UniProtKB/Swiss-Prot annotation:
Aspartyl-tRNA synthetase with relaxed tRNA specificity since it is able to aspartylate not only its cognate tRNA(Asp) but also tRNA(Asn). Reaction proceeds in two steps: L-aspartate is first activated by ATP to form Asp-AMP and then transferred to the acceptor end of tRNA(Asp/Asn). This is Aspartate--tRNA(Asp/Asn) ligase. Keywords: Aminoacyl-tRNA synthetase, ATP-binding, Cytoplasm, Ligase, Nucleotide-binding, Protein biosynthesis. One of its GO terms (biological process) is aspartyl-tRNA aminoacylation.
Length: 601
């Protein structure tokens, strides 16, 4: 028999009854039932119940074992009595009668519990992550993550893509976030950067003629922590293809990712045909370029119904500024919600005020004496005819309600989108048991930066502008669209991509609009710029955020619940104690000196 085990703790079945076996694992818990000891023995694969009674030669030692000790047990497989069968366990029809126990390792008093998985301070969990990872839910999440990545790899290989690895030590590249810099010992005063994405390398692979590339790529961004992003390091399914249009990218990746979702969705419906929604339409209908399509609320403009109306706040705004619009957030009642009345409207208004807004106008409709009429301050101010016209446009009736936002849409659309989401959550309209996918397409190429008072790239600076050189020379830059697209699932951006700009001339023109000269382009993107002068094929691709995809599929509440050794929200690795000061010797070798930041008065 093997030194440590003949079977795993998930392997034994009723067909093994009578066999003498050997198991090794962690003591999950110990129970004493009237002098008979029950030990749940756990390993990576599952749990087996071990029994030791006073007649067992292993009983004396069994009495000493404690939770999370590592032990080896030899014993005989026995069938459980019918009334003690546990159908929730893979090994629930059998138990192991202990004959010999060997203690392989003892455990100190635990800093956090493994059994039962109660809530525990996150910093303790991260400091003792090796114990935290023994918890069933987290352990399953990590195993599921591995399976999902494996499924992605298989899917890409079946589509004829080859996996190539690109450098981790590279040049600094302005891609929207700060770089992590690595000082060079050999080249004093110079620095490598960890890649924010393999963007330039994968494009260079297309120029080199490799046609279909993918990689499970680690990416590094020195960003301030956010709830929907892991600080420091994250992973993406990085993809690039030659001689393709954006439609080719969509029709290649959409079925593959749908298949991955269906494989791990545990029966929840997954969108089979992902709708293509133009960016402008997404902003108008959902107030977001990451719309949660499980929410049935679709916004509409109702400006005409408030122009010259009795509601002077909106009417005066419309008269004073041609950019002003009034958007409606219509909410239809369901059997589950019942009629939507003043109480819901008041809660929504209070929520809006809590976010710093002056409030949220509303109308709710009810039936009185056989007639449907609008109620609330807005309905009273604009009158019966305009209220009825709004209801007719939006398809609203008795029991329904509508919220209103007014101003310059460029300034209020995000709040309108948040109000749409809040209304959907308030009335429980969002179906949590499905995965709703879409592509957001036709992104703006440029945007106006209020902070810097200049034009900047809206997204990926390497995207191909729609219309090419001709559009560049004839259009207002802020009206240019890019061959750029995002994939969205349940309100989360899960992928971003574009058709790339492979023209050196157009590349220089694109960067000139944001204030970078040809010399700047050659200095910052020299490798790519040079490559494009030696025959670059039309190419494009995308990158799916693996961490977010896994988080959605396992239903985790944050990204740290699907990552092995994540940093905390202060970008610290509490387990390894990183970041940490360098030693004087290390600093001397790198010709570096730490200069403390002056303290502010």
């Amino acid at each position: 028999m093997h030194r440590y085990r003949s079977h795993t703790c998930a392997a034994l079945r009723k067909s093994d009854v009578g066999a003498t076996v050997r198991l090794s694992g962690w003591v999950h818990r110990v129970r004493d039932h009237g002098g008979v000891l029950f030990i749940d023995l756990r390993d990576h694969y599952g749990i087996t119940q071990v029994v030791a009674d006073p007649d067992s030669p292993a009983f004396k030692l069994a009495e000493t074992v404690r939770g999370e000790w590592v032990i080896r047990i030899d014993g005989v497989v026995k069938a459980r009595a019918d009334e003690t069968v546990n159908k929730a366990m893979q090994t629930g029809e059998i138990e192991l009668y202990a004959q010999e126990i060997e203690i392989l390792a003892v455990a100190k008093e635990l800093p956090l519990p493994v059994f039962g998985e109660p809530d525990y301070p996150e910093d303790v969990r991260l400091k003792y992550r090796f114990i935290d990872l023994r918890r069933e839910t987290l352990h399953k999440n990590i195993v599921k993550r591995t399976q999902i990545i494996s499924s992605m790899r298989n899917g890409m290989s079946e589509l004829g893509f080859a996996e190539y690895t690109t450098p981790i030590l590279t040049a600094s590249s302005p891609e929207g976030a700060r770089d992590f810099l690595v000082p060079s010992r050999i080249h004093e005063g110079q620095f490598f950067a960890l890649p924010q994405a393999p963007q330039q390398y994968k494009q260079l692979l297309m120029v080199a003629g490799f046609d279909r590339y993918f990689q499970i790529a680690p990416c590094f961004r020195d960003e301030d922590p956010r709830a929907d992003r892991l600080p420091g390091e994250f992973y993406q399914l990085d993809v690039e293809m030659s001689f393709v249009t954006q439609e080719d990218v969509w029709t290649t990746m959409e079925p593959m990712m749908t298949k991955v979702f269906e494989q791990f969705a545990e029966g929840k419906p997954v969108t089979k045909q992902w709708p293509r929604i133009p960016y402008d339409e997404a902003i108008r209908k959902y107030g977001s370029d990451k719309p949660d399509l499980r929410n049935p609320i679709v916004m509409q403009a109702v400006t005409e119904h408030f122009a010259d109306s009795g509601f002077k706040i909106f009417a005066s705004m419309i008269a004073a500024n041609p950019k002003v619009e009034v958007w409606a957030i219509p909410v239809k009642h369901t059997e589950a919600t019942g009629a939507i009345g003043r109480a819901v409207c008041d809660r929504m208004n209070a929520w809006a005020q809590s976010t710093g807004q002056p409030g949220l106008g509303y109308i709710f409709w009810k039936e009185e004496d056989g007639k449907v009429a609008g109620s609330g301050p807005l309905a009273k101010n604009i009158g019966e005819e305009r209220t009825a016209a709004i209801a007719a446009q939006l398809g609203l009736g008795a029991g329904d309600a509508c919220f209103f936002v007014a101003g310059d849409p460029a300034k209020f659309y995000k709040f309108a989108g948040e109000a749409r989401t809040r209304a959907g959550e308030e009335l429980n309209l969002i179906d949590r048991d499905r995965f709703e996918m879409c592509w957001i397409v036709d992104f703006p190429f440029y945007e106006w930066s209020e902070e810097e008072k200049k034009i900047d790239f809206a997204h990926n600076p390497f995207s191909m502008p729609q219309g090419g050189l001709e559009a560049f020379d004839s259009q207002d830059p802020l009206t240019l669209k890019a061959y750029q697209y995002d994939a969205v699932c349940n309100g989360f951006e899960i992928a971003s991509g574009s058709i790339r700009n492979q023209s050196p001339e157009l590349m220089v023109k694109a960067f000139e609009k944001v204030g970078l000269s040809q010399t700047d382009v050659e200095e910052r993107f020299g490798g790519l710029y040079r490559a494009f002068q030696y025959g670059a094929p039309p190419h494009g691709g995308c990158a799916f955020g693996i961490d977010r995809v896994v988080m959605l599929l396992v239903g985790a509440k944050n990204l740290r619940e699907i990552s092995l050794f994540p940093m905390n929200q202060q970008a610290q690795d509490l387990l390894m104690g990183a970041p940490a000061p360098a030693t004087p010797t290390q600093l001397r070798e790198l010709a570096l000196r730490v200069v403390p930041t002056p303290k502010k008065d």
